[in-house]
Amino acid sequence: MADAEASATMADEAKPDSKTLQILRDMANRLRIHSIRATCASSSGHPISCSSAAEIMSVLFFHVMRYKQADPKNPDNDRFILSKRLSFVDVATGWLGQGLGAACGMAYTGKYFDKASYRVFCLVGDVESWEGSVWEALAFASHYSLDNLVAIFDVNRLTHSTTLPLEHSIDVYQKRCEAFGWNTLVVDGRDVEALCQVFWQAAQMKNKPTAVVAKTFKGRGIPSVEDAENWHGKPMPKERADAIIKLIESQIETNKSLEPKAPIEDSPQINISVIEMTSPPDYEISDVIATRKACGLALAKLGHANDRVIVLDGDTKNSTFSDIFKREHPERFIECFIAEQNMVSVALGCVTRGRTVAFACTFAAFLTRAFDQIRMGGISQTNINLIGSHCGVSIGEDGPSQMALEDLAMFRAIPNCTIFYPSDAISTEHAVFLAANIKGMCYIRTSRPETAIIYTPQESFEIGQAKVIRQSVNDKITVVGAGITLHEALAAADDLSKQGISLRVIDLFTVKPLDAATIISNAKATGGQIITVEDHYPEGGIGEAVSAAVSMEPDIVVHHLAVSGIPRSGKPSDLLDMFGISSKHIIWAVERILMK
């Protein structure tokens, strides 16, 4: 009884006074007016959806959250996730269903890496709660006890074109969130006093994230529009806007505003500006090792170089070899399970405000499921690093469902994305360290088969710089490869040399940016003939990248070897041969060109 009374007393003390409550109501109405004016001026936008959440936003920003208005990127500020990347909002989530995953990454970073007081708030629409990625995020947050995370479900029942099946069945939303292990609070989203109460309750919860299920109405406060269908995404007609604004203004009782609470300044000072390779790669020329394993070893080494390096994996760590990082840095490894969309979103959240250097690992084929998150990461100008293993038909017996043959096309389409395609363990280690230090998204494509060491430990690598690894004055054709096909090109060069035919062989190292200058100069030195060979479909891969790079050179011809057709299960060597990218097929291509 005493505990209950104490709890009630605490709740009473947390209540704002009547003047503060009125200011919060007035600020909500000002937000409605701003949304109407802004969308009318731009002839685009969502004033109706904004109106449903106005009280939620007013209470959050002017009563609950702690932040410095003049310093929106301050690491101690509370975080808020909505739909656009503004100065205060760290990630773009305009395509629905992604915000909560990013919020999970921010909350995980705050709780486990920063060990700081800042909290994370994410506004989730009832419409987007139909996206599976939302439920991946709900499961993740519960599993990791993210009690510094609050998700606010804006349940206004209306969709873009109709009504949701659940409409205002608030109890169903409540039960679903509770089933996923969340502390769930139901509230009238129009009642600022009730909102203040539930957000206070959320702050008291330990070891569980909190879901606030708020019953709201689209178009709240707008006559003939509130809770009406077919208004989504439409500005108010300009001939009605002035009258609506005057009506809302008549409900405002004060000109006062509220200042947000100052943040608690307890985030650690960190430095991720330059992470140096502490020693050269430790490999011998006689070593044989898969680039996927070399990548895992490189991540562990990188983790020793900087304690803000983290690794995420989607339950493939014993195949991607990210488990090596986990063994050496267990407190900085995040298991995301089979939920690739959420894994990428969590990584996006972890790297915001420069708090971590994150690498997310899985099979390259599985990253295609997260293309939506990757695309929005590009729009957010994120610094995440993605590692895709088991690329191409060279993975062998696992079959076509596991073979990434579209991933280069996918990542080449992302603005400012750097694509590494290392061909041996030494270049892989350099790719990892380079990715850790460059701004923008990075993708590292690794292979399953064990391959020989090509480079010496002293070799240096740069982004956008290809390597000419076989050349002579007698070279007839330039062969461009990367990863497994580079080794096939070297084997073809060895066999052809016995016939007195010399090939020039180029290792791209980075597919994007492409070293066009090196490719063009070497092609001109070998009669203008280029053969590209890749473990990827023809569309969007190395061949098309090289063709685009030399397209303005009239005397250069590109011959393209790639995987044509749906692959099958088999031995790696058999599949390379079956799909026309083995050393034998390179030799045949050379012979055909020279016969002409």
From Swiss-Prot:
Positions of thiamine diphosphate binding: S49, G94, W95, L96, V127, N156, K218, H232, E340, F366, Q402
Residues engaged in binding substrate: H46, H232, R292, S319, H390, D398, R448
Cofactor note text: Binds 1 Mg(2+) ion per subunit. Can also utilize other divalent metal cations, such as Ca(2+), Mn(2+) and Co(2+). Binds 1 thiamine pyrophosphate per subunit.
Location of the active site: E340
EC number: 2.2.1.1
Chain positions recorded as Mg(2+) binding sites: D126, N156, L158
Protein name: Transketolase-like protein 1
Taxonomic lineage: Eukaryota, Metazoa, Chordata, Craniata, Vertebrata
